[in-house]
Structures are given as C-alpha cells and as structure tokens.
Swiss-Prot record:
First-listed, main subcellular location of the protein, grouped into a coarse class: membrane
Protein's name according to its UniProt entry: Potassium-transporting ATPase potassium-binding subunit
Originating species: Cutibacterium acnes (strain DSM 16379 / KPA171202)
Gene from which this protein is expressed: kdpA
Stored InterPro entries: KdpA
Protein family per UniProt: Belongs to the KdpA family.
Subcellular location: Cell membrane
Length: 556
C-alpha cells in the first residue's frame, strides 16, 4: 500500500509539473520580453536611479551583478555581527566573524550552507531582513543570468543583453513573491509554524521542562524551496516537523524545488521562438533526473545489515512520516537542483546511495539544476555537444543559428572547469598541507573512506552552490569556513561572468541560414548527445575521487 501511495503521488507530481512548467514557462517568457512596467516596478527604478529602457553590455551587466552581490554580503555580515542590538534578536549574541563571513557568502550565492545551528544562533530579524531577503534576490539573480544568456542567442549583431536591475525587479515581484505567498499559505494549512514568538517554555507530559521554538517559518520555507536556496529555519531543515509537517507538505516542497528549473526550458524555447529547442533541453533534464532517481532508490532499498532487514529498509537518518521512498525523491531533487534542503540525513544513506547525491552535484546540477543556473549550465553542455558533433562531421558548429567559434568554446570550457577545480583543489589542500590536515581530521567524525566522502561532499556542495552536507563533518572551523566560503564565492561568480561573456559574444554574431548540413538541435538524437556529453565530462573528472570514497566504502 505504501508503494502504491508513493507511485500515485509521484504520478501526480509529474502531472502537476508537466502542466505547471508549460504555463509558468510561457508566463516567464512574457515577463522578460514585456515593454511594460508595473507601478511598483516604476517606483523601484526611481529609488534605484535606474533607466529601465537602457540596455547593458555584458560587462556592464556583470558589474551590476557583482556590485549588488557585494552589497548583499556586507549587509548580511553586518546584520549578524550587530545582532544583539537589533530588534527581535531573542537575546542571541553576535555571530563570530568566521561563521558570519561564511553565512553571508552562503546566502548571497544561493548556497545556504549553514555552519551553525539556526535556532540557537539567529534571531527573527536576521532571519527575515537578512536570510529571507537573500533567498529572493539570489534566486532572481540566477534567473536573470539565464535570461541574459538566452538574449545572446536571440540577438543579432547587437551589443546589449538586457538590464540586470529590470530583470532582478521583475523576477522578484512578478514571479517569486506571488508563488511563494501561495506556497506559504499552503504550508501553514499543512501545519508549518508562522508566528513571531520566541522560545516557548512548557511542561511536558512526563513533567519535565521543554523549550519549543517558534518564528516566521512557513514564509521562509516557501522561498527556500521555490528559489532552490535550501537553508533551514531550524537545524533539522525540512525534516523538522515545524518546517515540513506531513507527507503531502513534503511532496509540495519537492514540487516547489522542481517548479522553476523545469519551467525555464520552455521560457528558453518561447524566447528563441522555437519551443522544440526548449523541449530538447527539458528532455535531457528529465532523463538524467529519472535515471539517477532510480539508481539512488535501488541503492537505498538494497541496503545491507540486520537493522535494515528488520526495518524493511535502511531507515537511519530518515523520518518515519516520510518513509524511504519520499526521502530518496527529496534527496534526488535537492541535489539535482542547487537547493540543498534535506528531509533526511544524506550522511546516513548507504555508501552507494550517498554517492548518487554526490554525483548529482558533480554533474553540475543541470537536471534540472538551480533556478537559472540549471538552464545556463545545460546550455553550455549543449554548446559543447554541438562542437563535438561538428568535429565528427567536419563542419563549423552552430547552435540556434549562431556559429560556435574559438571564443565561445574557450568560455564554455572554462565554465566546465571551474567547479571541478574548486572541488579537487579544496580537498587536496585540506589533506596535503600538514597544518590544515590536522584541523580537518578533528572535523571528520567518520575517518576512512566515509571521512573522505564527507570532505569531498562539502567542497562539491559549496562549489555548486548547493548547501547540503554529510553532517558528520564539522564545518565551523576557521579553515573550512574560509575555504568553503571561497569555494561558494568563486563557484557562483566566476561561472556567472563566463556566462555573461558568452552571451556578449553570441549577441554580436549575425545568424547563419539553416542548410541541409545543419545539425538539428530539437530531436531525440541531440538530447541523447547532451546527456552523454554531461556524463562524459563528469566521469573524466571525478571518477578517481569517487573510487577512493563512496565506491571503496560500498565495496567493503
């Protein structure tokens, strides 16, 4: 009966996403191509001193993104350091500099890596004015970058790729806020907490004292999932009953996680005026998502050991109210996107099951990926796939009528190399430098192969702006706070700059006519080429470290 209920829920989720992505994708395309501004948007532009009709070159667009994000880091860092003097601080003290630095970068980069216990560290004001605000604007920034890249394919001999301030404002006001508001009301109806109380001291049934935390949880939970942010109001994240009370709210959160990433391919298709192109990208995302979901489920349900046999499945670290099937679906969704929220502890998965959560991020989080980042990551894979196909037949590669020249390929290759470089260099430094290694060894709760997996997972999560963790690693040390903070910063903004530069290169190119030798990029063959290109790139880079960590652990 449990399996029947889960499969029925999975079918309903797929149907709901299929319907929603069609309408939301079309709506987002209208939002970013409209010439009209709402009154609220006009007021925002006046306050910011922005001319909404002025286009920006890719360099100007990049400067705006970096300046806005820098201000966000400074503001969020200051809020944490000044917390004792802020309202609704609940008596919490100032957050230490290393954790404040790490947290500020984490939320501005859409990572939401948490090297602290939220309910024990932060008051309501920092949660609302700091973290919740960044959940909105960091998600909007990612979507804006994806739209800027699409304009690179659409533009013909131009120099501008849109206006960052307009894209940011429209995305926040017209897309994220309305959906998040509806989702918050649904979560409240399901039992999620939404109040402004502090800690409630009560006497338990057995007569002992108990402290029950409260706060504006549902409102932050909604945008945390919708914006693929992932940072929890509580340390238990979405496994906490105040954030995610019931099985149906769990499915709702999975729906929110996947909604925008799976809708953006249609936005892409509508903006390039060929929805078949969007369908090909969407199909590649769905194939990778489904294959990894099935593989992870198979690994978890085949868990070994006496406890697993008695429970019917390896239930350590999983919530009884969700069960193994929903836990696996949530884990696959949160690591296939850049969300990082958890309703079960990934560190407690079987060795091979945990490897698939790691592998999902190593793919570059492209199926469907984070809001914005998933689409532009998949489009880079598509550009590389077109180049490989061009080499096979001896033709100059083209994609959507644009020739892919040396400049475009260099930018695409650099984009692909950023994340693996950050992950492997971060792990190597942590283990090769004696002083750092001794610090890391004290942070690893499970030495050996699993300890290596915990460290690799941390740097992979940070560099991909995911934010989930193998919780056996204590990441609050000065070295890991600084190193993971740097990985989050570089893993977010170096790819963004490369994507904007790629858009700038494409928008200047004139379209070339379609000929009999042009590679069709809207059929099943091209979708297959994209899938295998993504797998090939990941296998070449990460297979050695996977053999030393989760594969070795799983075979022992």
């Amino acid at each position: 009966m449990t399996w029947i209920c889960f499969l029925a829920g999975l079918a309903l989720l797929a149907i709901a996403l299929g319907i929603a992505q069609h309408h939301l994708g079309t709506y987002m395309a209208r939002v970013f191509t409209s010439d009209k501004d709402t009154r609220v948007e006009t007021w925002c532009y006046r306050v910011m001193g922005v001319n909404p009709r002025a286009g920006q070159t890719w360099k100007s667009y990049a400067r705006a993104v970096l300046a806005f994000s820098f201000c966000g880091v400074v503001f969020l860092y200051a809020l944490q350091r000044l917390q004792p003097w802020l309202p609704w601080s609940l008596g919490k003290g100032s957050v230490n500099p290393a954790v404040s630095f790490n947290t500020a970068i984490s939320f501005v980069t859409n990572t939401n890596w948490q090297a602290y216990s939220p309910e024990a560290t932060l008051g309501h004001f920092v949660q609302l004015a700091g973290l919740c605000v960044q959940n909105f604007v960091s998600a909007a920034t990612g979507i804006a970058i994806a739209v800027a890249l699409i304009r690179g394919f659409v533009g013909h001999g131009e120099h501008t790729i849109g206006n960052f301030w307009v894209d940011l404002t429209r995305c926040t006001l017209r897309i994220l806020m309305p959906i998040a508001a509806v989702a918050a009301f649904l979560l409240i109806a399901g039992g999620a907490v939404q109040n402004f109380t502090g800690f409630l001291h009560v006497t338990g049934v057995a007569g002992g004292n108990q402290v029950i935390p409260g706060g504006p949880v549902a409102s932050q939970e909604a945008i945390k999932e919708l914006g693929t942010n992932g940072g929890g109001f509580f340390n238990g994240n979405s496994s906490h009953p105040f954030e995610n009370p019931q099985p149906w709210t769990n499915m709702l959160e999975i729906f929110l996680i996947l909604l925008i990433p799976f809708s953006l391919p249609r936005t892409f298709g509508k903006m390039v005026e060929d929805v078949r192109q969007g369908r090909a990208i969407l199909a590649a995302m769905v194939v990778l998502f489904t294959v990894n979901l099935c593989a992870m489920a198979a690994a978890e349900f085949s868990g070994h050991g006496t406890a697993a046999r008695l429970a019917g499945a390896p239930m350590e670290g999983k919530e009884q109210r969700f069960g193994l099937a929903q836990s696996v679906l949530f884990a696959n969704s949160t690591t296939m996107t850049s969300t990082g929220a958890v309703d079960s502890m990934h560190d407690s998965f079987t060795a091979i099951g945990g490897m698939f959560t790691l592998l999902n991020m190593m793919l570059g989080e492209i199926s469907p990926g984070g809001v914005g980042s998933g689409l532009y990551g998949m489009l880079v894979i598509a550009v590389i796939a077109v180049f490989i196909a061009g080499l096979l037949v001896g033709r100059t590669p083209e994609y959507l009528g644009k020739k892919i020249g040396p400049r475009e390929m260099k930018l695409s290759d650099l984009y692909i190399l950023v994340m693996p470089t950050l992950v492997l260099c971060g792990v190597a430094l942590s283990l090769a430098v004696p002083g750092l290694r001794s610090s890391v060894n004290t942070s690893i709760a499970n030495p050996g192969e699993h300890g290596l997996s915990e460290l690799v997972y941390a740097f992979t999560s940070a560099a991909n702006n995911n934010g989930s963790a193998f919780a056996g690693l204590d990441a609050s040390t000065n070295w890991l706070c600084a190193a993971l903070g740097a990985a989050m910063l570089l893993g977010r903004f170096v790819p963004i700059i490369l994507i904007l530069a790629l858009s700038g290169a494409l928008v200047e190119r004139e379209p070339v006519p379609v000929t009999a030798g042009t590679l069709p990029t809207h059929n099943a063959l091209f979708t297959t080429l994209i899938v295998f290109t993504a797998i090939l790139v990941t296998a070449l880079v990460f297979f050695p470290v996977l053999t030393l960590g989760p594969l070795a652990e799983g075979l022992i």
